[in-house]
């Protein structure tokens, strides 16, 4: 998300199934931020997105004033449900917005915002810890980055990315590669990359010591190249 259009959390309110749990909404927020943070490019996060920032579904808050643009940096109060956003760019969707904004199940609590922030900060630590996730050159990216298991046979909702430092000039003196799996599906996934059999992969220390218990269940089978 950015300053234009809905915030990332508000997009989830509009696009995810209405019965999606708040815990899964937090995970989707983290996953969405991960696709930016771990994808080589300079990362751009909208202010407050790590706290599930809401503008009450306002898609253009430039002239909406402090009421719709405010952020509680203490993480104690979500601004979701502050009222119907101004008519200028939103009135056509008021009928859709009104019941959503009135639903207390869609308003994050302090614990939800804290979980989202902790997971988001873990992502920044991962990016800082692994130089291979910020190669800094289009030529290096083209040379070292690939997407195993992509194409027609890809698992729906899952993207596997390999940054292979055994190809070309060495970038990271400590790591020979970085393997990233983005799983937007509702189920746990297994990805086999036979070409990586015999190589060793472990969670970064930021993940192994981080806030996400699900991420910590990740395993690597070197014999088969399966994560």
Please report, for each region that a protein language model flagged, where it lies by residue.
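C-terminal beta-sandwich/jelly-roll accessory domains of carbohydrate-active enzymes
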Residues: 186-227
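Loop/helix patches that line or flank the sugar-binding groove of alpha-linked glycan CAZymes
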Residues: 1-179, 184-190, 198-199
